[in-house]
Amino acid sequence: MKQNEISQKNSEFWSELCGSQLAKAIGVTDSSPASLRKFDDWYFEFYPYLFDHIPFSDLKGMNVLEVGLGYGTVSQLIAASGANYTGLDIAEGPVAMVNHRLEQQALSGVAVQGSILSPPFEAETFDKIIAIGCLHHTGDLAEAISRCYRLLRPGGSLIFMVYYSYSYRRWLQAPKKTLRYLMDEIQGKRSVIGVAESKDRAAYDTNSSGESAPHTDWISKKSLSVLCQEFSTFQPTLENIDSTPPFQRWTRSQLLKTRIPSLMGLDLYATATKS
C-alpha cells in the first residue's frame, strides 16, 4: 500500500479505541469516571513496567506530546502529573476519548487529530514525546522517529514502544521471515519487517470485527538504534509476555518475573535523548 492509503486505513481502523474489546470483557460499558478508573486500574496492573519507562512524577511543567492515544489511560495520567499535555492521534475516536477524559477530570491539555508523519506542530516544541505502541503502525517508522526528533527541544527525549522482531511469538508464528531478517542483519542490513500477512498482524492487533491492523512493523534493537542515530543516546529494553503456548503452564504475573521478557519479549521499549 502507498503511504496515503495506509494513513487513511489507519484513521478508520484505529477510530475504534484500542482496548475496546478488553473494556467489554471487564465490564466497562461507558466512559464515566468510575468505568474509566476500572479500565485504568486494570491497564496499569497488566503493564506494570510502564512506570519504569514513563517518568510520570517528573513531567510537571514539561511540554509533553503523546502520539497514539488508545483508551486514554496514559494520556490522563500524563495530564494529571502536571505536564502541559498535547495528544496526537490519526483517528477521531481516541482524540474524542482523551478530550472527554480531560474535561471530565478538569485537567488542562488537548488532543488533536493528525499524523506524526506530518505533525501540526512547530519544531522544538516538546520536552518529552511518548509513543507507546503507535509508531510501528504508521507505515514509515523511520520518518515517524525523525519527525519526533525534530519536534523535541535540545535535551528532550522520545519514549516509545515498538514490536520486537525476535520475540518468542515471531519465532513461533513466522520462523522463516524471522530467520531471513536475522540473516539480513548478520550481513549488515538494517531495516524493519514491514510486509506481513494479515494473520501475522492479527496476532498483535485486531478490531471487534476481527480485522487486523492495516500496517505493522517489527524491528530489532540494532536496526532501531540506526533509526535513532540522530539522537545522542539510545537505551532499548525488552518487555511483555503472554500466558500462551509455549508458556501456558504459568500465569502472566509469574512469567513477568522471569528473564524471558528481557530476552525475547514481545515489545521493544526505548528512550532516545536529543542533545
Where are these regions (language model features)?
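Class I SAM-dependent methyltransferase SAM/SAH-binding core
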Residues: 63-65, 71-118
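A short acidic, Gly/Pro-enriched loop at the edge of an enzyme's catalytic core
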Residues: 117-128
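Conserved alpha-helix/loop element of class I SAM-dependent methyltransferases that forms part
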Residues: 34-62
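A C-terminal cap/extension of S-adenosyl-L-methionine-dependent methyltransferases
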Residues: 180, 186-275
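Conserved class I S-adenosyl-L-methionine
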Residues: 157-193
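N-terminal, positively charged/glycine-rich alpha-helical extensions of SAM-dependent methyltransferases
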Residues: 1-36
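A short SAM/SAH-binding and catalytic strip from SAM-dependent methyltransferases
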Residues: 128-139
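A short glycine-rich, Lys/Arg-flanked "PGG" loop and its adjoining helix->strand segment in the class I
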Residues: 142-154
